[in-house]
A protein has these predicted regions:
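Short amphipathic alpha-helical interface segments
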Residues: 14-30
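Short, cationic-aromatic polyanion-contact patches
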Residues: 4-17, 66-85
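Long, contiguous binding/interaction regions
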Residues: 79, 86-87, 169, 181
Length: 204
């Protein structure tokens, strides 16, 4: 992994520091939580605290009220824009959202929240859509909600073994909360979920 990074003497970072930076870049995280990143990386809390302190001192991350933010300096440390494409992602659900619920409001209500065995990881924003990310308590599955205008897609990224049942349960825990947020106006409609090559359609 270290060969994907600039060998710049100005950065006094170790291998673990670089591994953390690689994950932050891989996930395109703009903000993240300590607890979520700890589970994502499987690191001891004290180890991660020391790493984040070094990254903060180097200007790669900054503390915020609701966790940490990733600064633009991370781009200075990259030779290219490496992303690991070998992960196992599965689309669990695609649905429409009420058009009269602003995306910003929905994101604000979801970010930082815990659902069942899902723990908040962080958020990425490409300007056209927002992706909110959670991780299971055991760090085995990452669940992502992609929100773009009136569309919602929920995906699972398997970091350990591929447990579809756990992923689907996590997906519906998240969808249930989103439905509650939308219920004053209109509930989420026409949800479909995918398992392998099969697709299923449900109605609200």
């Amino acid at each position: 992994m270290t060969d994907e990074w600039h060998d710049l003497p100005d950065f006094s970072l170790g291998e673990r520091d670089i591994d953390v930076l690689a994950v932050l870049r891989e996930e395109d995280l703009a903000t993240f939580s300590f607890e979520g990143l700890k589970r994502r990386l499987g690191l001891h809390p004290e180890t991660l605290s020391r790493i984040l302190l070094r990254l903060e001192q180097e200007g790669f991350v900054e503390k915020k009220i609701d966790g940490y933010g990733v600064t633009s300096r991370i781009n200075e440390f990259l030779r290219t824009n490496p992303k690991y494409n070998g992960d196992s992602r599965v689309t669990l659900l695609k649905t429409f959202l009420p058009s009269d619920i602003p995306v910003a409001r929905l994101v604000s209500d979801l970010r930082g929240r815990w659902f069942g065995f899902l723990r908040w990881l962080g958020l990425s924003d490409d300007g056209g859509s927002v992706t909110l990310k959670w991780i299971t308590e055991d760090g085995g599955i990452q669940v992502e909600a992609h929100i773009s205008e009136t569309a919602l897609t929920i995906e699972a990224k398997f970091l350990q073994e591929k447990n579809m049942n756990t992923a689907l349960k996590a997906c519906y825990q998240l969808l249930n909360h989103i439905s509650q947020l939308c219920s004053p106006l209109r509930r989420v409609q026409n949800a479909s979920y995918c398992s392998g090559s099969n697709a299923y359609l449900t109605s609200a």
